[in-house]
């Protein structure tokens, strides 16, 4: 991993002072913008929460020597706030206060000048990036092919709260000859990406987003009699979301693809602690461990888990995936993995390549 001493020092100080920094930044923010606190009942609480998120992503970026982790997160926040009609100046002010407050706290804590400077550099880089135009996120369901139309109709059913019709639509497509692989990748995956985009655009709420995800998981389960009937090939997979990550549907799809490829799989679900993963590796002796991370704030947890697995007597191959790895294609090398995959089909292809 391409780590730096000053980055690790800065990350450690941010984690140690997280709560105090959040409170100090929030206090300074409302000293400058008292009208914002008056206009929203929970403004101070929300500001402190947002500050903690900023600190978490900044800490991850510093610990992995990856300024793009924080910069990309800030651009995402800027896009979200723009669609909520919150002026961009609010985020600029917030980040500038964050930078100055960190500098003050680092000086008080006796940090090295290098640790302070690299932190300021990361924040200033993110500020410079959001001064550019915030890119639009295009619809994931464009096109007029059969699967494009099916995906749009399926999403419309879910947004109307009609899970039964959505499921019937998918089952009918399979009966007419569509493969489960295509349904997963060309319908479910794209629809869930579109659901995320709609949430970011403030067109649906968290409850609708969760409903769409839960409904899709339920519909996926109807395919399990077929998925688990594939001829076995004598290879084993353990799959899980890293501790703290509650977004499990992606790694569930990956696990199902391995099952359809003939692997014996052991799916551990979301938010699995290191001890739980190590226990399963000892008991199942898998050939591959697949770990998913949805947010960049979980990357250090992934690195810690992979290091713990590598320290075991006979570690499996380590495969990672998730949004942070898609955004930074070579990140998996720095984090200690053996490979990375952008979707379920690629994950199986990578793992099958290791068995040759």
Regions found by a protein language model. Give the residues of each.
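Core of compact, soluble alpha-helical bundle domains
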Residues: 1-96, 100-174
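Amphipathic, non-transmembrane alpha-helical secondary structure
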Residues: 75-78, 96, 171, 274-282, ...
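Long amphipathic N-terminal alpha/beta scaffold segment
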Residues: 104, 141, 163-164, 172-251
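Active-site-proximal alpha-helical scaffolds that flank and shape metal-associated catalytic sites
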Residues: 122-128, 132, 240-241, 249-264, ...
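A structural micro-motif
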Residues: 235, 263, 316-317, 338
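Cofactor-cradling patches in redox/metallo enzymes
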Residues: 255-260, 266-333
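Peripheral docking tails and interdomain loops at the edges
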Residues: 324-356
């Amino acid at each position: 991993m391409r780590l730096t001493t000053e980055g690790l020092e800065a990350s450690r100080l941010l984690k140690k002072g997280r709560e105090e920094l959040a409170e100090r930044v929030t206090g300074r923010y409302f000293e400058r913008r008292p009208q914002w606190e008056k206009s929203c009942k929970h403004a101070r609480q929300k500001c402190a929460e947002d500050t903690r998120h900023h600190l978490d992503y900044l800490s991850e970026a510093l610990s992995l020597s990856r300024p793009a982790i924080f910069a990309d997160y800030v651009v995402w926040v800027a896009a979200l706030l723009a669609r909520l009609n919150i002026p961009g100046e609010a985020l600029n002010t917030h980040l500038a206060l964050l930078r100055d407050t960190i500098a003050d706290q680092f000086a008080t804590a006796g940090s090295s000048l290098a640790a302070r400077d690299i932190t300021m550099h990361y924040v200033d880089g993110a500020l410079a990036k959001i001064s550019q135009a915030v890119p639009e996120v295009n619809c994931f369901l464009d096109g007029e092919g059969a699967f494009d139309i099916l995906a749009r109709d399926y999403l419309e059913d879910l947004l109307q709260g009609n899970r039964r019709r959505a499921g019937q639509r998918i089952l009918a497509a399979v009966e007419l000859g569509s493969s489960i692989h295509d349904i997963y990748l060309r319908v479910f995956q794209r629809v869930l990406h579109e659901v995320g985009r709609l949430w970011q655009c403030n067109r649906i709420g968290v409850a609708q987003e969760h409903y769409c995800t839960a409904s899709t998981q339920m519909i996926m389960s109807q395919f399990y009699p077929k998925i688990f009937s594939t001829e076995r090939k004598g290879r084993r997979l353990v799959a899980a979301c890293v501790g703290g990550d509650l977004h499990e549907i992606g790694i569930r799809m990956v696990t199902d693809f391995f099952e359809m490829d003939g692997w014996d799989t052991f799916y551990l679900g979301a938010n699995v602690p290191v001890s739980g993963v190590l226990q399963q590796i000892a008991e199942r002796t898998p050939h591959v461990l697949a770990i998913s991370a949805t947010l960049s704030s979980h990357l250090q947890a992934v690195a810690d888990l992979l290091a713990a697995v590598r320290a075991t007597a006979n570690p499996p191959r380590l495969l990672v995936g998730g949004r942070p790895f898609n955004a930074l294609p070579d990140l998996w090398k720095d984090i200690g993995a053996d490979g990375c995959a952008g979707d379920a089909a690629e994950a199986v292809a990578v793992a099958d390549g290791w068995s040759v």
